[in-house]
Each structure stands twice: as C-alpha cells, then as structure tokens.
Amino acid sequence: MKPDAHQVKQFLLNLQDTICQQLSAVDGAEFVEDSWQREAGGGGRSRVLRNGGVFEQAGVNFSHVHGEAMPASATAHRPELAGRSFEAMGVSLVVHPHNPYVPTSHANVRFFIAEKPGAEPVWWFGGGFDLTPFYGFEEDAIHWHRTARDLCLPFGEDVYPRYKKWCDEYFYLKHRNEQRGIGGLFFDDLNTPDFDHCFAFMQAVGKGYTDAYLPIVERRKAMAYGERERNFQLYRRGRYVEFNLVWDRGTLFGLQTGGRTESILMSMPPLVRWEYDYQPKDGSPEAALSEFIKVRDWV
C-alpha cells in the first residue's frame, strides 16, 4: 500500500489526546495546550501538565512540519533526499513525577516521508519508549519489558530483542559510562516489509506506552519519601539533562534546524541539581541504582 501520511497524522493526533486523557485521569490535573505554527511550513500542539497531584511536569507534544527541501544537515547523511519535499510528524512525551519512587518515562513515535514527481517516495517510521528509575524495583522493570516484548511478538520473535538492544545502545551516556535508565524499545528507519506492517507496529508502540507505564505509577505514587530521596531524584535528573543536550539526536536536530525551542526543551525536568564528585553511601538504595540500570535481560 502507498504510504498515507494523512492516516498517520490522524492516528498521532488521537494518540496525543488519549495519552493526555490517561495521564490526567491518574493525576487529577489537566493539560494546558499551546498550538504553534512554523513559518517554513507546519506546526503542532504542545500540551503541558504542571504541578499536578502525581506529575511535577508532563509534556506531550505533537508536531507536523513540512517543506520544499530538506536542510543540508539531513541530506548530507542521506543524499537520496536531496531535491525532495518532505513531511515529518510525530508525538513525543516525557513525564517527570513528584515522587522519586515513580520513574521518569519517555516515549516517541514518528513518521517521515520525502517525495518528488516521478519517483517513489522515501519514507520510514521510528520511535520507542524508555524508563528512567531513581530507585530500582525489579517487578517494575520486568513489567515494563514484558509489556514491550508482548507488543512486539505479533511482528516477529526477533523484534523485541533487536529493538531492546538498540534502546540500550542509544540511551547511553558515553561521558559517564552509564545507561540513562533501564531502556525499553528504540527503532528507526523502519520501512519493510510494507507501509501497513510498519504503521501497525508504530501504533502498537504508541498505544503500549501507557500499558507499560501507568501500572508502575499506580504502584509507587503513594510511597512515602523524604528530603534524601528528593535530593537524589534531582541529582539523577541531571543525567537526563546531560543526555538530552549532549547526545540526543532529536534534540540536536531540532535545535540545529530552527525547530520550536520551547517544544524541543519541554522534555527537561523543571528542577534539577548537580553535585561535585557525588558518592552515595555504600549499601544504600542510592548506591544500588548504578547496578540496577546496567544492561540485562529483564524477561
């Protein structure tokens, strides 16, 4: 089947609505919407929930940008895109909870298509979701990865292991020699065997995110915590900022190509702290995190 960008856009708009409704139902607060237009073509809907009952900040962004030609930074890596008009659309979200026992989560699904008259379109899907705990709970990690594995199974037995590995490799802070969290799924450049198959997989990932995340939120949101746990959460959020500004391809691409800065940086935690040469106490739950986030097979 020929790629249908309109069908993908409708799914993404509905996905943004659904995820916002689900997060609001857990939190009790509502999202505030900020619609925006891009001068060069396209626009989006940024939605943010701040200082809710459960979430300190949750941002769910939809964007759809288009143009007559790709930026040089993109065609340098993919010369086949030169001289083509393009559309790029996606939903991207990050949730930063109040409670340090509730992990931070991130999800993204996206579609890209570049066309020119008389030629076959170049298109692909990408996306995934990943979890960043501050305190490790094995049952949460197993549930997260089991949900990821189960949504992948209809698409092939090799899909989950392949995209889990890609996620582990992508969300890695080289300058710290550590993972950002416990991973999940990450895929890009997906365009085989055909459009329908790839679109169905992207939909499964988009819908699977809340199945993976919300049970963990419900399990942990009422756990008692104090200043020690909060300080550790803020310290570990620093790793999130470091990854996004130093290593994340999407953030860098957006900032380098004149994307909407407010939406791109919506993923940042509202409060964060750094501490020189921080060393957690031996045997403490904080010290256990470095071992917990090391790459392993959870299911």
From Swiss-Prot:
Coiled-coil residue windows: none
Q: Where is this site: Important for dimerization?
A: H175
Sorted alphabetically, which HAMAP family does this protein's record hold? Coprogen_oxidas (MF_00333)
Q: Which GO terms describe its biological process?
A: protoporphyrinogen IX biosynthetic process
Q: Which InterPro entries match?
A: Coprogen_oxidase_aer, Coprogen_oxidase_aer_sf, Coprogen_oxidase_CS
Q: In which pathway does it act?
A: Porphyrin-containing compound metabolism; protoporphyrin-IX biosynthesis; protoporphyrinogen-IX from coproporphyrinogen-III (O2 route): step 1/1
Catalysed reaction(s) here are: coproporphyrinogen III + O2 + 2 H(+) = protoporphyrinogen IX + 2 CO2 + 2 H2O
Cofactor(s) recorded for this entry are: Mn(2+)
* Name of the protein in its database record: Oxygen-dependent coproporphyrinogen-III oxidase
